[in-house]
Amino acid sequence: GSDYNLTLNGMGGNSIRYYVDGIPMAAKGESFSLENIPASIVDRVEVYKGVVPAYLGGDALGGAINIVTNESKKNYYDISYRVGSFNTHQVDFNAQIIEPKTGLTFKPSVGYNFSKNNYTMKGVRVLNPEKNEFETGDFKRFHDDYRSVFAQFETGFTNKLWADFLYVTASFTNVDKDIQTGATQDVVYGAAHRKNRSWNLGIRYRKKNFLAEGLTLSANASHTWQKSTTVDTAMVIYFWNGHHRPADYAELN
């Protein structure tokens, strides 16, 4: 759930473009990113430094990262569960079912991530109410939960005379993130949080040797609805020990 900055050729931020199967990742909304894409759907990761292939259709100065999902032509089921430090849990499920007579394909995918992020902050300042002065100590982060859900369903046809594939896709992404600190660790929050939700509908098509040998037609279209909310209603000031006192303004103001 932490912010990240990936650098290629000394450039980062908007100088790098991210894609999933050649489609801009941003098409699924801001809540869908590298940190919450289900690992089990990834077949390989293509990294391009500097020059970006024409089929990606991007103009990134630093380069591009294209995540290629499982392209198997067989039925499969894949489920995984991972656990890590600071009460981190990750669950992924994806499958592919192909109807043998018609070639109609169904591809459901679900990913869930959760972490408390309650690691220890060392040498932070807290208010001692008895002495009415600040003291230094080590305290765990108490308001830094991260939770994300990604669900996608694809259906379409593969390996037809008229198409290598034609898929219609519907997806939903939800990210809930507590806000623990401000620009520095001296500013502590205990109630404010952010929510991001995205709904996406899309269609993608590809046909090699379209009308002529060596000519490939690739097309995609999508529409995304997105809602971002910052909740900041607590009129209090928090300290690293979890205690708080009343204030005349909200936390993020």
Segment roles from a protein language model:
Residues 1-24:
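Extracytoplasmic beta-strand/coil segments of soluble accessory domains associated
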Residues 4, 63, 89-93, 147-153, ...:
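Hydrophobic, lipid-facing positions within transmembrane beta-strands of outer-membrane proteins
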Residues 23-49:
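Short acidic/polar hinge/loop motifs at secondary-structure boundaries
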Residues 39-78:
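A beta-strand signature from Gram-negative outer-membrane beta-barrel systems
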Residues 50, 68, 80-86, 98, ...:
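Outer-membrane beta-barrel pore domains and translocons
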Residues 82, 101-186:
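Periplasmic-side early beta-strands and strand-to-turn transitions of outer-membrane beta-barrels
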Residues 119, 142-148, 164-214, 224-253:
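Flexible loop and strand-edge segments within Gram-negative outer membrane beta-barrel domains
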